[in-house]
Amino acid sequence: MQRKLATWAATDPSLRIQRLLRLITQPEWLAEAARITLSSKGAHTPGVDGVNKTMLQARLAVELQILRDELLSGHYQPLPARRVYIPKSNGKLRPLGIPALRDRIVQRAMLMAMEPIWESDFHTLSYGFRPESSVHHAIRTVKLQLTDCGETRGRWVIEGDLSSYFDTVHHRLLMKAVRRRIS
């Protein structure tokens, strides 16, 4: 299904994908989202509800059915994220919100549906938070762009850092872009 979503999105950039809720609430889809979520290292870290991987796995089938019912009925409400502070190299603290595992499963299910749709819209040289890309891919691309058959072509590299970017994302504009692509 992800390939179909990617193909539809790439074929028609103005296409608005419909009925994603039906897709992400399919039992197999939620089960795969749970499998991926629970196989991550972070699954051992509980959210504000205190539920960890072991506790959730003990009642996974029931919890997935509850999530499905809540999503389909419109009654799903994510729990507040548990706030922790991670020390940064400059001595400051970075706030980190840790969602409950059930919310991470819903987020993963949404990612599995939305990522193939959005991938075709992103610039090919954009490397941040993309599947099959990393800092190493970006460095390799810059290196290739600066050399040609061993000869140096470019002399300038500009490093930039968008300070506290995720804290300053304009959510209204982001949601407007999402609504253009997904109904």
Please report, for each region that a protein language model flagged, where it lies by residue:
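Non-catalytic terminal/accessory segments
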Residues: M1-S183
